[in-house]
């Protein structure tokens, strides 16, 4: 990892959005990394109906971008509802609280004594204005894996987006983004041997996302 980082600092330091030769070289490095990360996560970031893999500064930014960005992705709609589980990382719970401060409704999905999210209670929380359900793939304290694919199936018919925080699972257990059926998935590189300060948000094709930062056009304007 250190050797790869040193090569990039030496040979790929330019802005990958620039048209000059060093910029295009940097762009090839970035796109190669994007392809490799997508392959690890069972996603497709090339060709028709390609998924989008957005590099971030870490898991916290990826989760915040997912919760706030997807919830507010439809600019014409007013505040709606977001559902999170009771065991989410602070980088999911606090963005949800931020939405609540803006007038959104936030409901919390409870867990069983063994730490598994109560998927059977989800249907009772869904509302016509539900925009997003966010449940982590594996818990950062207990290690319990959550029934994310089941939750995604329950939301798919209603057109509700599902995000999963996979920071603790990526690189340790196989992940197939398409099989999970979620719309967004977050990872952090340092959890599986990568450098600190790098994460990613994987988005299914067609998911609308409100950016957190403005003024740059890289990575689909995010």
Which residues does each PLM region occupy?
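Pyridoxal 5′-phosphate
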Residues: 1-222
